[in-house]
Amino acid sequence: MGSETRPLSIFFFPFMAHGHMIPMVDMARLFASQGVRCTIVTTPGNQPLIARSIGKVQLLGFEIGVTTIPFRGTEFGLPDGCENLDSVPSPQHVFHFFEAAGSLREPFEQLLEEHKPDCVVGDMFFPWSTDSAAKFGIPRLVFHGTSYFALCAGEAVRIHKPYLSVSSDDEPFVIPGLPDEIKLTKSQLPMHLLEGKKDSVLAQLLDEVKETEVSSYGVIVNSIYELEPAYADYFRNVLKRRAWEIGPLSLCNRDVEEKAMRGMQAAIDQHECLKWLDSKEPDSVVYVCFGSTCKFPDDQLAEIASGLEASGQQFIWVIRRMSDDSKEDYLPKGFEERVKDRALLIRGWAPQVLILDHQSVGGFVSHCGWNSTLEGISAGLPMVTWPVFAEQFYNEKLLTEVLKIGVAVGARKWRQLVGDFVHKDAIQRAVREIMEGEEAEERRIIARQMGKMAKRAVEKDGSSWTNLNNLLQELKLKKV
């Protein structure tokens, strides 16, 4: 069969963390629906998660599958079976995990040599995949999994180092050159960015990420042009990157079953969850979740409980503890009994997109990870912003100052995995602010407009639909 008639073959290589895997699996499903032969490359421990997410697409006859390569985590100081960043036992093990991820290069190259795909979509944390693909004449597309805003702000901070001009960690500085005046403090920046931290594994890795991004074929962005047009243009015209925004990727999950099967097995039955939501009035429930990686200490969980109770709002709270012990006394005494008629507590994984899309949900308390942020935007929801680490403080600025659909809870310090401590009064205030009063209604109107815009973008002839088809057409012309 000639290259003109055989389907385009693309390898998708997500970093082993749920926040990276889920959107890339969505992306592979989206590409498969357009006739692309898609192969998702992962490690044996992560294969079941991906398999459950693509089962329905396979039944529909689309060409999508999973292949595995070995992960040598124990050689780098990781516990046996630790193959996902979300399962590392401590923040100190994060660096070991990134080192171990580098050992995937050799088996990945063997896979490329054997199968010769037409393109590789490689996660940002596999910067070497640009050179690996180039060995076999294969173009590599980078996937960061974040917003244009965060990409632009992060690069401006990295290049210009504006934090060197301030005398304290809490003194604000302006990020130079951006379309909007955005202020941050040193305490809100990733620690590996700051001077004196350049010898860290992560700092070196992120330098490689930027270098190989420039030499790659281009960047796929899980966003919508209409959401952040000034930053999409800045990324292309000022930073000189080739890019295609094809999001929101989560919208490829159309029905209840697809939304429920996304990610890990939920800790609650989807029908029980929907039944509870169906019993509530429209826009009356606050959804509280901090992503798959953030795990708060017990004293912070107790503070969240007190703040939510004092807010007087109905809520769904997804609880993930830092501690592995089975004690249940970390919540205030009598809390669950007092809120039982207006709260649903989920200990573990939640069917997030299913919940956010329900008409009863009227607000979202989020850690500002980009997947959650874009899922909230797609659902048309105002948000309480509670950034913890990674690029989340940038995303908070996008929500609160550019899009104006967010209310900051007051987290001020970047802290790996565990976050800055926030008191119950601040939590109560922020939750009420997105749910009550005229300003809350104004935010909700803006958020709803953005939700409609997101859905239009992925429909036929929408901006993201058009970008995807243009990219696929370009790749077909470049077939190996």
Swiss-Prot record:
InterPro entries: UDP_glucos_trans, UDP_glycos_trans_CS. UDP-alpha-D-glucose binds at residues 19, 350, 352, 367, 370-372, 375, 391-392. GO terms for molecular function: UDP-glucosyltransferase activity. The active site is at 20 (proton acceptor), 123 (charge relay). Keywords: Glycosyltransferase, Transferase. Disulfide bonds: none annotated. Pfam families: UDPGT. Its EC number is 2.4.1.-. The keyword Transferase applies. Transgenic cell cultures and transgenic plants over-expressing UGT73B6 exhibit a 2-fold increase in salidroside content. Belongs to the UDP-glycosyltransferase family. Glycosyltransferase probably involved in salidroside biosynthesis. May catalyze the glycosylation of tyrosol (2-(4-hydroxyphenyl)ethanol) to produce salidroside, the main bioactive component in the root of Rhodiola sachalinensis used in traditional Chinese medicine. This is Probable UDP-glucosyl transferase 73B6. The lineage of its organism: Eukaryota, Viridiplantae, Streptophyta, Embryophyta, Tracheophyta.
